[in-house]
Amino acid sequence: MKDLLQPMRGESVLDIGCGTGACLSALHEMGLQVTGLDPSTYMLDMALEKMGNRVELYRGFAEDLPFDDNSFNYSCLFTTLEFVNDPAQALREAFRVTKDRVFIGVFNRYAIKGIQRRVKGIFSPTIFNHAQFFSVWELKQMIRTIIGQVPVSWRTVCQLPIPSGKLVTNLEHSKIVQRCPFGAFAGMVVVLVPRFKTRPLAAPYQAKDPTGAATG
């Protein structure tokens, strides 16, 4: 997340769907001014217990953020889109309140782990029974539908089915592996491009008299 988001210390970030505060802690360690939002008072209580007064916490929904336009330098939706009622509206709101970059982290629809979760949910109830999963391509299409052609970067996390070790760890962190669109977890950063509305201004103009005498 840090490599994609490239935050500057002292700037502000909103964690949308902060839950118990796992991401809040990581964002705070980056030197950011952190605000968290979640619809669950239970989750917010746990986040407050973990973070204390180091962050600001609000109760609210991703589809209707209680903040003004451009309130934050960055926003994060870390495993949030899977559980909201309207993912596209959640993205619109994130783009509205953010000035610079938005990080989106999701469980990959086409990863082997993602398929296993869906199959497991058929036979026993899990937290993922009502979750929506997304692929890298679906996220990019949704983003472009909402705000047009903007710079987008992404990486995935792959867990190779071989014994762990230094070589395996280095391989999993290599750029080639992280560019695999079938990794278990996908992280994407959207760079927001300012857009300006223009309108014609009435400028006073008086035509010269073509019949007037020439001077000189």
Which sequence ranges carry the predicted segments?
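Class I SAM-dependent methyltransferase SAM/SAH-binding core
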Residues: T20-D64
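Short alpha-helix
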Residues: H130-W154
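Conserved alpha-helix/loop element of class I SAM-dependent methyltransferases that forms part
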Residues: M1-E11
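A short glycine-rich, Lys/Arg-flanked "PGG" loop and its adjoining helix->strand segment in the class I
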Residues: A88-D100
